[in-house]
């Protein structure tokens, strides 16, 4: 493996009536996604895949990054395709599955840095560097809470093989 990393920003600009969604204003969500995407484009050198599951295309303002091969948009209509009682986590898993199947950048990488697309991970370069030099053989890097027995999926680093299960 060549230790190639790609940042995968997961997005649902129009959540519709998804349960447990506190921010439903599509315009605000769109601005937050655009701001975060701009942050990663300016603060990192990694290729970025923006995977959006409500069929909303925001690629127009980022054309120069697409044209130079730094950014890939994968947009599909997936938010209506599952039982909403399964929740946002299930929808996010479907986004990653779709990216595995349809993204050229993901196909070419060794590791995915999955970040919830509205968030700006200020230490993203340090996190990737830590993984690259300290944990390159680790299947997954994520914030884990042993007391609660859950993993925070807002950010994780993993090889593609882990996600294929």
PLM regions and their residue ranges:
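ER/Golgi luminal nucleotide-sugar-dependent glycosyltransferases, focusing on the catalytic module
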Residues: 1-165
